[in-house]
Curated annotation (Swiss-Prot):
InterPro entries, alphabetized: Cell_div_FtsQ/DivIB_C, DivIB, FtsQ_DivIB, POTRA, POTRA_FtsQ_type
Example GO biological process: FtsZ-dependent cytokinesis
Extracellular topological intervals: 47-260
UniProt topological domain (Cytoplasmic) ranges: 1-25
Pfam families: FtsQ_DivIB_C, POTRA_1
Species name: Lentilactobacillus buchneri (strain NRRL B-30929)
Protein name (database record): Cell division protein DivIB
Membrane topology: Single-pass type II membrane protein
This protein's GO CC annotations: cell division site; plasma membrane
KW Transmembrane helix (keyword) present: yes
Domain POTRA: 48-119
Annotated keywords: Cell cycle, Cell division, Cell membrane, Membrane, Transmembrane, Transmembrane helix
Reported function: Cell division protein that may be involved in stabilizing or promoting the assembly of the division complex.
Amino acid sequence: MGAQDQNGKNHGGLFRDFQNRNVKKMWPLVMPITIILLVMIFMISSYSRVKKVTVSGNEIVSDQQIKAFSPVKKGTSLFAVWGKTDKLAQSLKQRSRRMQSVKMKLVNFNQVKIKVEEYPTIGYLFVHGGYQPILKSGVIIKGKVLNPKAGFPVLKKFQNPKKLRRTIKQYRRISPPVRAVMNTISFSPTKSNPDRIFIQMSDGNKVYASISTFGDKMDYYPSISSKLKVKSVINLEVGAYSYPIPQKQTSTKTTSVQGY
């Protein structure tokens, strides 16, 4: 009886050894097949694709436009997104000149979050009965609006593209508080100064300046206007001086502007 039990144990041990040896031999084959099967199951599942795309930070460009421009959409394979979010964000940024920066990241495993920063509007160009926004980058948006926002000047009478670009370049140098009190900037050349511009201020003062220098000189405007007792014409073409705006039966007295 004891011999039979011993033989049974020996047979059981040999069988287990046989199983272990076979498992060890087959493991190098089973492991890759298992991985391949898991990958295939993942690829055909909904978890392998972008579930949702959200947009934030935009004010002018709509969510719908950004999603349409984006190379990543709902249903895009995650294999096309992993490790490529910076490149994809840069591709999206190039689709609209209004976008100053774009950041893209994956959240909650398969959701894409797009954060946009837009170039702000700093003025408008009047053209053919409409107003084209001028961005902080200097770019003029071709799409026109009928009612420009208050607090931004309108550029008028600029037929020469080069002079317009120079004017915008100088205008961008002016501090935002001064920009906010500029109503219009009109190209107003003379024989003696082919680069002269005329600026109508919201406080009623009028300014004449040169394209090449008004970007720096206009920042002195608050100091100059604070010394004026009446609405005046301020000339910043050469130096700085002012005189009251001419009215009927009123003599025009030239006043030197101090502090510039």
